Amino acid sequence: MRCPACNYNGTKVLDSRPVQDFGSIRRRRECESCGYRFTTFEMVEQTPLIIVKKDGTRDEFNRDKILRGLVRACEKRPISIEQLETVVSRVEKTLRATAQHEIPSEQVGRLVLNELASVDEVAYVRFASVYKQFKDINVFFQELSELMERHQDTEQENQT
């Protein structure tokens, strides 16, 4: 690595530590020529995730778009923005773990719903109504029934 002060191409690493939540490493360096100390950050370059929409068009994965949808679904609910950012981070982490570069939008929606169900059931129903585009009240009731079953299963697991 070149020294930013004297442009010498030799530095030694004095300290190296991970940076939380950013997947990067902070390194404290010292120039072997002039002794100048500086900090660098090293991070893995992520390949972009491509979301394939229902109509076949492709868009790059956008955390902000998911977060905006979650904020709308959680209006007037006791849910912090930090909780919603955690949902988005978990969804993105799961998507990246699949090692696929193109992911159907339906898969993204299912992941968001699964994460949201554990945060707030009302927000889950609101998000599901937009994501699943309920055509009539029967589909809405079916979704509510599935959510109630999942809730009861979770309660039973917590009691054992």
Curated annotation (Swiss-Prot):
Cofactor(s) needed for function: Zn(2+)
GO molecular function: ATP binding; DNA binding; zinc ion binding
Encoding gene, per UniProt annotation: nrdR
Transcription in keyword set: yes
Its job: Negatively regulates transcription of bacterial ribonucleotide reductase nrd genes and operons by binding to NrdR-boxes.
InterPro entries: ATP-cone_dom, NrdR-like_N, RNR_NrdR-like
PROSITE patterns xref list: ATP_CONE
Domain ATP-cone residues, every copy: 49-139
Free-text cofactor note: Binds 1 zinc ion.
One Pfam family it belongs to: ATP-cone
Keyword Transcription regulation: yes
GO biological process: negative regulation of DNA-templated transcription
Organism this protein belongs to: Exiguobacterium sibiricum (strain DSM 17290 / CCUG 55495 / CIP 109462 / JCM 13490 / 255-15)
Superkingdom of the source species: Bacteria
Keyword terms, alphabetized: ATP-binding, DNA-binding, Metal-binding, Nucleotide-binding, Repressor, Transcription, Transcription regulation, Zinc, Zinc-finger
Family note: Belongs to the NrdR family.
Protein's name according to its UniProt entry: Transcriptional repressor NrdR
ZnF (unnamed) residues: 3-34
